[in-house]
Amino acid sequence: MKICYIADGSSIHTQRWLNYFAAKGHEVHLIYWKTRPGYHETLRIHLLQRFAPKIWPVTRYFSFLQWIFQIRKLVREIKPDVIDAHFIIDNGLLAACSGFHPIVVTAWGSDVLIFPRRNFIWRIVAGFVLKRADRVICDSEVVKTGLLSLGTKPNKISKVYNGIDTSQFSPRRADEALKSRLGISGFPMVICIRHLRPLYNVEMLVKAIPLVLKHIPQARFIIAGDGVQRSYLENLAATLGVSQNVSFVGYLPHDELPAYLASSNIYVSTSRSDSTSLSLQEAMACELAPVVTDLPANREWIIDGENGFVVPQDDHRALAEKIVYLIENSETRVKFGKINRKLIEDKAEYEKEMGKVEKLYEEMITASKMGKASQGH
């Protein structure tokens, strides 16, 4: 197959998705204005050019108009079998304006759950893109419901997970040298891997830490991620007197995550909105016990008291209580971890999920060719 993607080239999620198909021998093209190292050697990257004046928001909209013409030209040259645009609002619109079919649009979460609710223009854009799309991929029931509310026909929607490489994300990846370097050997370790932005509400975890330390002074916390709130959160930790127990390690390359997760005991996510969280699934694959906020997408994976705990949003006291319980009750923690590993192996293994996408592409290409053939008679 010749597959053309319009997707954020700087995202690890894009890279993992595209590298699968390139490694399988498909001809893969990526169109975007920025990229990252680590793509498969056979993958072809087409960087969009920006010639707009450096005046915001003029730059954004002028560049977007330019990109439409650039993409139409690139698509004519590439002659793909299928286009898959990741993120509805911008990349989906570029695909919808490409003049090409068949088009797949892959929703990432906020493009359905947040942006269309903030602005009626984005809602109109989302509706237009979803109408033009031949198929739509999502990774959770809450996003599927959102797609339906935006007018997507049910038979267009396929639910597929990004998938976890269970050989890479495994409890066997525990790294004592890492724990020693971080100064946490022999201590219970809680980890949070989220962007440090208001949406992910990591402040809730920082506020919970003093309450945990009252009961378990030796507990250690790793906050992995970067963003506009990093300085604020570091200062908050200092103000609360917990800096000695918290390590802000910044953004971690994807290949370093397994060691951090497998060396931890408890995973925390405090997000205010989410689709299926890849970092949650990675933690589950490493047999961690999760404590997550009460979101529909989280409840698809975590049943409160059965394989983790679900706490109300913004309730740092409830979060602290569950963290303390899991540290003090190792049998429960281990039980949750074993259940979670099995769940990921059964429902979200990387090769299986990407195989579903591959089959979807093949079906669409076949249907498109049959449609064109029938029109020719």
Regions found by a protein language model. Give the residues of each.
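N-terminal subdomain of nucleotide-sugar transferases
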Residues: 1-37
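Conserved donor-binding/catalytic core segment of Leloir-type glycosyltransferases
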Residues: 4, 178, 183-200, 206-209, ...
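Short alpha-helical donor nucleotide-sugar binding micro-motif in glycosyltransferases
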Residues: 75, 251-252, 259-264
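Carbohydrate-associated surface elements
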Residues: 142, 163
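A short, well-ordered alpha-helix in the C-terminal region of glycosyltransferases
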Residues: 218, 318, 325, 332-347, ...
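Aromatic "clamp/platform" in nucleotide-sugar-dependent glycosyltransferases that forms part
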Residues: 272
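Short hydrophobic beta-strand element within catalytic cores of glycosyltransferases
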Residues: 289-292
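Conserved acidic donor-binding segment of nucleotide-sugar-dependent glycosyltransferases
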Residues: 304-305, 309-316, 325-331
